[in-house]
Amino acid sequence: MTYQKIILAGGNGYLGSLLAKHFSNEAEQVIILARKPKAQIGNIKTIVWDGKTVGTWVSEMENADLLINLCGKNVNCRYTPKNQEEIINSRVLPTRLLGNVIKDLMAPPKLWINMSSATIYRHAEDHAQDEYTGEIGYGFSIDVCKAWERSFFENELPQTRMVTLRMGIALGRTDGAFPRLLNLVKLGLGGRQGDGKQYVNWVHEQDAVLTIEWLLNHKEINGIINCTAPDAVTNEVLMRTIRKAYGIPFGIPTPAWLLAIGAKIIGTETELILKSRWVKPAVLLDNGFEFQYSKIEEAVHDILSLRI
């Protein structure tokens, strides 16, 4: 095995499941820290924690090659005061807890990757935002990211390399955004959303996983990393690409006012669809990371080839 131990805090979600499966073939142990117990599957073991207090899970942190913190309440909800508090606390509290625990370990994780979101950048239709010159936006989603990253970088951990991964929208067949977009296409509703000019910072799920392993093996890299495909596309292009690949010739567009009504009905926010996220993974590209799926057409065709 290449690695001794991989730890996934909050690793029962979409991306965590992908990482657990991938690293189960690369590591002796994969440890998932989760709120609910789960039977061990092969070398993947779940240990219960609440993300707020220390417990028996702390000993598992010793000698880990990699700790990935994936904790966070789903933002696909209405931004009520209660939900806003839960969204922030579910990210900040586990991050601070992990930092405090790592400080006292004899053999702390070699690399700690903390998730963040590429939505931290401003609404951008004029040019791409990268790690060097990107402009931070404003609003609740950005405040969440700023608090999340601040709670991460407030730690001084000389024995642990630290990376915050500003994730784009991971696209895959089984979960995440793609199945929902595909359902709209199947219903004939796969036209542009709003004016369709807003950019979507996507990344194929395989590239998201490979980025994390690449970071594990490139010890000179730390700090802020954008995890998005290099070829961002507009919402209109994304929807047209899915329609064409699936063989649906048309798609009824959804104007912004109708999206606002629909968002209230299903309990979400239009910002998740209408904000233009044009983000470039400059650090990955500058340091030689090679995307398997850099073009949206390649990614969509691959995902749709995985018929279930």
Specify the residue positions occupied by each region the protein language model found.
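Conserved Rossmann-fold NAD(P)-dependent oxidoreductase catalytic core, especially the SDR/UDP-sugar
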Residues: 96-138
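Conserved beta-loop-beta element that borders a ligand/cofactor-binding pocket
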Residues: 150-173
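Glycine-rich "substrate-gating" loop/helix at the edge of Rossmann-like oxidoreductase active sites
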Residues: 136-139, 168-175, 195-205
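Mid/C-terminal beta-alpha module of Rossmann-like enzyme folds, strongest
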Residues: 215-266, 301-304, 308
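C-terminal amphipathic/interface module of NAD(P)-dependent oxidoreductases
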Residues: 1, 250, 271-308
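Alpha-helical substrate-binding/gating segment
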Residues: 182-190, 198-232
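NAD(P)H-binding glycine-rich loop region in Rossmannoid oxidoreductase-like domains
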Residues: 45-94
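N-terminal Rossmann NAD(P)H-binding glycine-rich loop of SDR-like oxidoreductase domains
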Residues: 6-26
